[in-house]
Amino acid sequence: MSRLSVLTEAIFQDKHNVMIAGIAGSGKSYLLRQLYDESVKRGIVSILTSTTGVSSFNIGCSTIHSFTGIILPTQMPKDPEEFVSRIVTRIKFKRYLLKKWQNLKILFIDEVSMLGANYIDVVNEVAKRVRGSSSPFGGIQVIASGDFLQLPPVNDSFCFESPCWEELRFKNYVLTKAYRFTEQKWNDILQRARVGKLTKEDMEVLKGCVNKKNNSDIQPTVIYSLRRDVDDLNEVALDDLSSEFITFIAEDTLGEEEKTGSVNIIRHCSEEQSKVLDSTLNIGRKIKLKVGAQVMLVANLDVAMGLVNGSRGVITKVEADNVIVKFKGKEYEFEHPISPYAFKIEHQGEYYVRTIVPLIPAYASTVHKMQGLTIDCGIINCGSSIFSPGQAYVALSRVRSLDGLFLEQISQSKIYPNKLALNFEEKMRKKAVFIDREINDEEV
C-alpha cells in the first residue's frame, strides 16, 4: 500500500488522530496536503494549517494562529482561565468564527514540532468550550506532521509535553525515506547528524567542505543563527555593488474566492491587514535590490524548470516589470524573467493578497527562516555559530547536495539533538507504523 492509502484508511475509516513524523525532506508536508485534499473531496469540513509562514506558503494554507485567531503573549497570562474565557467570548460574539469552529471536523497541522505546549493547551480548551464537548479538541480530529529533532517552539516547551498531547492519543506514522536529497551519501550523513551520531568517515566528508571553492557566479546563501548577522551581511553586500538600487513596492489587497478557484480583488488592505501578511509571508512590503545582487526565489513558478521556492540566482538586468535572473539549474545555469507574483493567504474568512516580485536578497538567512525551505547552495558555520540543539541539523538539511554545501567551520560537538525530543521520538517509534513508497522528486 502507498503512504496515502495507509493514512487514508487510518484517518477516514478508523477516525484516528494521526501524527506523521519523519526526517527532513521525507515529504511530510506534501503528504499532509494530499490528505487534506482527500478530505475536501469527501466533503468533510477541514482546515489545513501550519505553525510557520514559510510552511503555510509552501503547502498553500493559513497559519494555525490565523485560523484560531489566538496569539499568545510572550509570557502566559497570570490567569489562564480568564484569558481563555475572553477568547471564547470573542469567538461566540462573531457568528462566522463560531460557525467555523462548530462545523470543523478535521484540523491538519504542519510543522507541529514548532507548536508550543502552552499554545496547544489553550487551543484545546477553547475548542472544548466553543463546541460544548469534553473530548480532546472538542471532538475535532487532529492530523499533524513534523520533526521534533528540528527547531523547537519559540519561548515555549514542546507540544508533546502538554497533557493535551496524551489526550489526543495519536496513531504515529514515520516516513523513513528522504526524497529531497538524491545523493545517498548526503542523505545518510544527514540522518546520522539528526540524532548526533556522525561517524569518523562522515566528519571527513564534511571537513572536505570547509573553505571549499565556489566556481559559480551564484554565491551560496550564508545561513546564520542570529537575525542581526543576516541583516548586516545582506545590507553590506548590496551596498558593495556599484549598480543603483531598484525598489519594489508590494500591492496588498483583499479578495474573495470565486467558483473557479481564482481570487477576485475587492479593495486594498488596511495597515492592520498588511501586518497579517508581514507576519505570515517570507517577503516584505518593500524590496530593495540591485543588478548583480544574489537573490532567492520565494515562490513556486515552474517545477519542471527548477523555478521553485528556494531557487538561487543573480540579477543580470531589469526590463520594465520583469527582473532577469540567472538561475542555477540541475545541469546548467540559465536566465529567466521574474514578474510580480500574487501571494495569497486565507485569514478569518477572507483572502489577503500581496503582489510583488518574488525575490529576496540571498546573501544570508537565519536557520529559523530556512526551516521548510530547500536551497541549491549554502555556507554554514557548524562551529561557533551554533548555540542550541537541532540548529546544525536544520541548517545542513536545507542544502540539496554535498556539491552545494560550503562550511566555514565544523565541530562534531555542535551537531547534536535535543535530548528531550530524542527521548520522545525513541518512545514514539516503538509504537509507530513505518511506511514508504516511491514518489517523484517534484512531490517533496
Regions found by a protein language model. Give the residues of each.
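Conserved ATP-binding/catalytic motifs of P-loop helicase motor domains
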Residues: 1-444
